């Protein structure tokens, strides 16, 4: 893994090769092992394969060609919703309407995303992490 990390670089042009669902699921499963806030896993991942949906996402990412050129686009989201529902089921107060929640969920999403990226690169896949989600989240939601 160290050699992979030392040699990593953003890949902006992709082959037509599809990413098998089994490999994608394996990478997502591995990434769930990432450190996170109190095991609350305050993130969600949206997987986009459909070319029409990638076209719709492109403007939110400043029309960078990696969005439409990649076989699959993953959008990593800070998301406390699942934990709030868990707390409600237990008649507990989640207390997630503050800056701390924003920070914790953002950190969780970033840790998950980085773990996913490391695992994908270890499997020989090229990735390009785009920070544009933060600029245009309202267009993506």
Say what each PLM segment does.
Residues 1-141:
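Acidic, surface-exposed loops and disordered segments
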């Amino acid at each position: 893994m160290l050699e992979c990390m030392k040699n990593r670089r953003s890949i902006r042009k992709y082959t037509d090769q599809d990413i098998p669902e089994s490999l994608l699921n394996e990478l997502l499963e591995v990434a769930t092992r990432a450190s996170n806030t109190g095991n609350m896993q305050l993130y969600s991942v949206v997987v986009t394969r459909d070319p029409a949906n990638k076209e719709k996402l492109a403007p939110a990412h400043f029309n960078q060609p990696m969005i439409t050129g990649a076989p699959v686009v993953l959008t990593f989201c800070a998301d406390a919703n699942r934990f709030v529902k868990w707390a409600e089921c237990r008649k507990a107060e989640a207390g997630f309407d503050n800056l701390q929640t924003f920070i914790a969920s953002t950190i969780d999403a970033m840790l998950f995303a980085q773990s996913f990226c490391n695992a994908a690169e270890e499997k020989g896949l090229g990735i390009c992490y785009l920070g544009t989600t933060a600029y245009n989240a309202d267009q993506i939601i």
